[in-house]
A protein has these predicted regions:
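Cytosolic nucleotide-utilizing catalytic cores of signal-transduction proteins
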Residues: 1-81
Length: 81
């Protein structure tokens, strides 16, 4: 998917975005806990995602396209397993 192709080469960014949007209802604290890292690490990764994709995971107008992209990516990957 084009919107996330720039972060697909950095697995921790894609994992963070997927966990943040799909699994933890955009909670940085819950995402950090689930990924066993500090909340500042999540903030850094979300900023990196914004810088690489042009979409901010914390900006309401940008969340929908990111959410659709990671949901499709998850479904695509689950079909390949």
């Amino acid at each position: 998917l084009k919107i996330i192709e720039d972060i697909e080469t950095t697995p921790e960014l894609l994992t963070t975005l997927t966990a943040y949007l799909l699994d933890h209802e955009s909670s940085m604290a819950n995402t950090a806990k689930a990924l066993c890292c500090h909340i500042n690490t999540i903030k850094y990764r979300l900023n990196s995602i914004r810088d690489n994709t042009g979409y901010s995971p914390s900006k309401p107008a940008d969340v929908y396209p990111l959410l659709i992209a990671v949901a499709i990516n998850r479904m695509k990957n689950s079909e390949n397993e």
